[in-house]
Amino acid sequence: MTNDANIRLECLKPAERWAQPSGEEVREVLRLAGLTGGKAAKVLGLGPKGDRTIRRWVGEDTPIPYAAWALLCDYAGLGLIWKEV
């Protein structure tokens, strides 16, 4: 886990080395970003029922795609995880 958030470091890697985050980690990134499910759906361009998609990611019914996760991490101030440091 990171020091400031309950997110495993392997979830903050470029796509080829990335580990799928848990629903709780998705929830934590949303919290850090200050986004509700509805707001997250809008910034990710998920469409009118996008908040339902967010709930599925948090509930672990559907895995979050890497691109969506990476953007949420950027909004949360966790950096550009798709770039090598």
UniProtKB/Swiss-Prot annotation:
It comes from the Bacteria. Keywords: DNA-binding, Plasmid, Repressor, Transcription, Transcription regulation. GO terms for molecular function: DNA binding. Residues 28-47 bind DNA. Acts with KorA as corepressor in the control of the kilC and kilE operons. This is Transcriptional repressor protein KorC. It comes from Escherichia coli.
